A protein has these predicted regions:
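Beta-sheet-rich non-transmembrane sensory/scaffold domains
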Residues: 1-441
Length: 441
């Protein structure tokens, strides 16, 4: 195997592209191209540090690579994040690599922070701090949107010019509002989905896009993520923060373990007046999926659906972890069901979103044909909570079903081996791949 490990795979016709990080993760990586008919190596292209995800443009002319550029553990080396654009119009042998970087935004850190972009690595410039995670491309192959998860922002990329044209902050979700409730504690051994004075950063992992009435919409799985390194960590439990008495007169009650005390928060944001205590509280991820305009405006969010639906469907397993059965409520203090993967598919004129829940497992299905009138369809989870998730030797019990869905792929009926639309899930913890046939009633 080339380099230090394969992070992402994409296929266009007979060409397979694989993103491979270097043995030294902070060094530049590469993309290897293979012939799908015999898996022979066709060629390679050098890209940025830690290529985390790649995708072909719909027309197959380019491969776009999200170079995450994470720092090393002591934060002594923090490579720049970037997007590599590999031009394949003249074949792999003549592939030309250009880089859409964030250098033009260096020196604008305070402006970006004021707009809501989280730039907070110790001493980091914009280029060093932004970590491209996932890419979606417009149907016309001209524009890409790239999520920077920890920064809670999207980058807009002009593919032909290989230029980042905008950085769009995604804002926060107010969990004190009706419809945005969450369960914030893993120490009450109960389902308690309620309103709290907390704002959740959307922080998507996977994103996808679709076109309706000549408008592109971005769909995000709002997983959430923090920075937690030996050299720098932003994580703190709310009970360990000093809360402003004016903003939180009931701080002592809020900070009890059974209330907000256990919820993971950040030390980076929330001290709005710089006096050393916290005037606002933030959490990681929104426990939902969202639809955004191409300009980054929120069009739809699923609110508290995921926790409410899983609580009703699996009341004894609510907010379980993905490697242990009988772990009721164990993820409530972190990111709840943790939506991570997303795929979109068109069936009989309707656009459906399939969202994988990394922790409790399963897939949420919504009809998003009208982004302003989204309809919940169903929740499917084949996990067997009645057996041990792990065998005595530490391996996954093959009887447990799927654990930790991460990657999702929709196969339309026209390309399906059985002529029916299919959904494929890659499940990280169980190491399983599952194919679901989608039946429309």
């Amino acid at each position: 195997l080339l380099g230090g490990g394969a992070n992402s795979v994409a296929v266009y016709k007979d060409l397979v592209a694989v993103a491979i990080e270097a043995s030294d993760p902070q060094a530049p990586g590469l993309v290897a191209f293979y012939d799908s008919t015999d898996l022979s190596l066709v060629g390679t292209a050098d890209v940025g540090a830690m290529p985390d995800m790649l995708t072909f443009t719909p027309n197959g002319r380019y491969v776009l690579v999200a170079n995450e550029g994470e720092p090393d553990d002591d934060y002594s080396i923090d490579p720049e994040g970037s997007i590599s654009i590999i031009d394949l119009r003249h074949g792999v042998a003549s592939a030309n690599v250009r880089t859409a970087d964030f250098n033009a935004w260096d020196g604008m850190e305070e402006t970006l922070r004021a707009a809501g972009v989280r730039i907070f690595g110790p001493g980091a410039s914009t280029s060093e701090d932004l970590e491209p995670e996932y890419i979606t491309v417009a149907n016309n192959s001209r524009t890409a949107w790239v999520v920077m998860q920890e920064a809670n922002a999207l980058a807009v990329v002009d593919i032909k010019r290989a230029t980042v044209t905008d950085i769009l902050p995604l804002g926060t979700k107010d969990h004190s509002l009706p419809g945005n409730e969450l369960d914030a504690s893993n120490r009450d051994d109960a389902i308690n989905i309620t309103s709290w004075p907390v704002k959740g950063y959307y922080m998507p992992d996977a994103i996808a896009s679709y076109n309706i009435d000549d408008e592109t919409y971005i769909v995000s799985a709002n997983e959430g993520d923090s920075r937690d390194y030996d050299g720098f960590s932003e994580e703190a439990r709310i009970k360990d923060l000093v809360l402003d008495p004016g903003a939180f007169p009931n701080a002592a009650t809020l900070q009890l373990d059974e209330n907000l005390g256990r919820l993971n928060s950040t030390t980076v944001n929330g001290d709005t007046d710089g006096d050393g205590d916290y005037d606002e509280l933030y959490s990681y991820g929104a426990r939902s999926f969202s639809i955004w305009s191409s300009e980054g405006e929120l069009v739809y969010d699923s609110g508290a659906d995921f926790e409410n639906i899983t609580a009703a469907a699996l009341p004894d397993e609510f907010n379980s972890n993905n490697d242990e059965n009988g772990s009721l409520d164990s993820r409530s203090d972190d990111k709840g069901p943790e939506p991570e993967g997303i795929a979109l598919g068109k069936i009989r004129g309707h656009i459906f979103a399939f969202i994988g829940l990394e922790r409790i497992g399963g897939v949420m299905v919504y009809d998003i044909t009208n982004p302003y009138n989204v309809q919940y369809i169903t929740y499917v989870n084949n996990r067997d909570f009645s057996v041990d998730a792990q065998l005595p030797n530490g391996t996954t019990n093959p009887l447990v079903g799927d654990l930790g869905p991460e990657g999702l792929v929709f196969i339309p009926a026209a390309k399906s081996p059985n002529g029916e639309p299919l959904l494929v899930t890659g499940n990280d913890v169980s190491g399983t791949t599952t194919v679901f046939q989608i039946n429309i009633e």
